[in-house]
Design a protein with these regions (language model features):
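N-terminal helix-turn-helix DNA-binding module of bacterial transcription factors
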Residues: 1-64, 371, 377
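Short beta-strand scaffold positions
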Residues: 10, 136, 287-288
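Flexible loop/hinge segments that line or gate small-molecule binding clefts
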Residues: 137-176, 201-203, 291, 317-327
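Flexible loop/turn connectors
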Residues: 249, 258-268, 281-377
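Intrinsically disordered, low-complexity terminal tails and inter-domain linkers enriched
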Residues: 108-121, 202, 257-283
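Amphipathic helical "hinge" segments at domain boundaries
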Residues: 36, 48-123, 130-133, 228
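Hinge/beta->alpha junction and helix N-cap segments in small-molecule ligand-binding domains
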Residues: 72-84, 102-117, 140, 170-180, ...
C-alpha cells in the first residue's frame, strides 16, 4: 500500500494540502465541521499526521517539552517524589496539547551522579531531542546535558535555586529546610545526628560514611549544611545508596552495627594515654527523603528499638506514605512544584520566572526527646 501523504489525503477529502496542514497546525482557520471531516478521513486512511521534525523546521517549535531525570526511568516510576512532580507537570502541559519527553540519565560510570561521561548516550539524546524547553530535575545548570540544551537554544527550567538572575527555576529553600529540622531536633536535646542521603558514589552502597563534597544533589548539600548549622553538634553523613526503603534500612542497620566509628586517624599502637577518638551513636536519624527515613524506621523496629524513645527519625518531602507512618518530615508542595515548572516550560514570558515555594515542618510521632547516652547496641 502506498504511503499516505498530505497530497493524497487532500485529494481524498477534496481540499488543498494547505487546508490539511491548517487542520493540524492552525485549527482556528477552519470550521469545526471541516476539521472533523479531515481528521476522520485521515484516521480511516491511516494518515499519521504531519512529520514532527519537518513541522518544527517550518514553524520553529516542536510542541513538546523535555524532562531531564537524574535516574533511570524504571526508578523514576517507583519514586513517590518523581511521580508526584511529573503528575503536576503533566496536568499543566497536557492541557495545552503539548507532549512530554522523559530523558532519564544512566548511572554515571565515573563515580559522579552529576557528571556523566561527555560521550554518554544520554547526552546524544539531548542533542537530538525534538523539544522546545527542558526541565532539569535536581541537577546543576552546568551539567553537560543542560549545557548542550542551552547551546541549542532550548529554554531551561530547573528545580534548584540559581544565582543567575536570568534563569528560570522552581524550588524550595533547602538550606532553610535543613535548619528547620536541625532546630526541631536541637530543641529536643539531640546533638548527635546521622543523615541518610541518596548517592551513586563508587563507595556509595548503603552504609558508607561520606563527606559533604561527595553529595551529588545540590538540594541534599544545602539541607545538610542547614542541619549542621542548627544542630551545632556531631552530624554524620551516611550513604543510603539508591533512594529506597530497602537502602534506608540497610544503611541504618550498618549504623547500628558499627563499632563506634573513629572520628580521627587511629594510632598505629593505641595506648591508655592515646585512646581512639570515637563518635557517640546518634540519637536521631534524618533521611533526606521520606523513603530513606521510612527505611530507617523499619530497621529500628526490626532491632526492637523504640521510635522515638530510643532514636528519633525525620524525613523530607511529606509523601503520602509519610503521613501513614506518622513520620515527622518537611512538607514541600511537590505537585505544585511540577505545575509551576510546567507553566514556565510552556510560556517563556510567564512571571515570576523564579518561584520559591513554601515549606513547613510537620511534627508527627517519630521525633521526641533525645535519649541519654551511652551508645546503642
Amino acid at each position: 500500500m502506498a504511503r499516505m501523504t498530505v497530497k493524497t489525503l487532500a485529494a481524498a477529502v477534496g481540499v488543498s494540502p494547505a487546508t490539511i496542514s491548517n487542520a493540524y497546525n492552525r485549527p482556528d482557520q477552519l470550521s469545526a465541521e471541516l476539521r472533523d471531516r479531515i481528521l476522520a478521513t485521515a484516521k480511516e486512511l491511516g494518515y499519521p499526521g504531519p512529520d514532527a521534525a519537518g513541522r518544527t523546521l517550518r514553524m520553529g517549535r516542536a510542541e513538546a517539552v523535555g524532562v531531564l531525570l537524574s535516574e533511570r526511568l524504571s526508578y523514576a516510576f517507583s519514586d513517590p517524589f518523581a511521580v508526584e512532580f511529573l503528575t503536576g507537570l503533566s496536568e499543566v502541559v497536557e492541557a495545552h496539547g503539548i507532549s512530554i519527553v522523559l530523558m532519564p540519565l544512566s548511572t554515571p560510570t565515573d563515580g559522579s551522579r552529576t557528571r556523566p561521561n561527555a560521550d554518554d548516550s544520554d547526552l546524544t539524546a539531548v542533542r537530538n531531542a525534538n523539544i522546545d524547553a527542558l526541565a532539569i530535575l535536581s541537577l546543576p545548570t552546568d551539567h553537560p546535558a543542560a549545557m548542550i540544551a542551552r547551546a541549542r537554544g532550548i529554554r531551561l527550567v530547573t528545580t534548584d535555586i540559581s544565582s543567575d538572575p536570568e534563569s528560570a527555576w522552581v524550588a524550595i529553600d533547602d538550606f532553610g529546610a535543613g535548619v528547620m529540622v536541625g532546630e526541631h531536633l536541637a530543641r529536643l536535646g539531640h546533638r548527635d545526628v546521622a543523615v541518610l542521603v541518596e548517592t551513586n558514589q563508587p563507595a556509595g552502597s548503603p552504609g558508607q560514611r561520606l563527606e559533604e563534597d561527595q553529595l551529588g544533589f545540590l538540594d541534599y548539600a544545602a539541607r545538610v549544611a542547614g542541619l549542621r548549622q542548627a544542630i551545632g553538634g556531631q552530624v554524620m553523613i551516611i550513604s543510603g545508596g539508591h533512594n529506597s526503603i530497602e537502602s534506608g534500612a540497610t544503611a541504618t542497620s550498618w549504623l547500628l552495627d558499627r563499632d563506634r566509628i573513629p572520628t580521627a586517624p587511629i594510632p598505629t599502637a593505641p595506648t591508655p594515654t592515646a585512646p581512639i577518638p570515637t563518635a557517640p551513636s546518634p540519637t536521631a536519624i534524618v533521611g533526606l527523603s521520606d523513603v530513606l527515613a521510612l527505611g530507617a524506621v523499619q530497621a529500628l523496629a526490626s532491632r526492637g528499638l523504640s521510635v522515638p524513645a530510643e532514636v528519633s527519625v525525620c524525613g523530607f518531602d511529606d509523601i503520602t506514605a509519610a503521613a501513614a507512618a506518622n513520620l515527622t518530615t518537611i512538607h514541600q508542595p511537590i505537585r505544585e512544584k511540577g505545575q509551576h515548572v510546567g507553566r514556565l516550560l510552556l510560556d517563556p514570558e510567564s512571571q515570576p520566572r523564579q518561584v520559591l515555594l513554601p515549606i513547613s515542618l510537620i511534627t508527627r510521632g517519630t521525633t521526641g526527646q533525645a535519649r541519654q547516652q551511652p551508645a546503642l547496641s
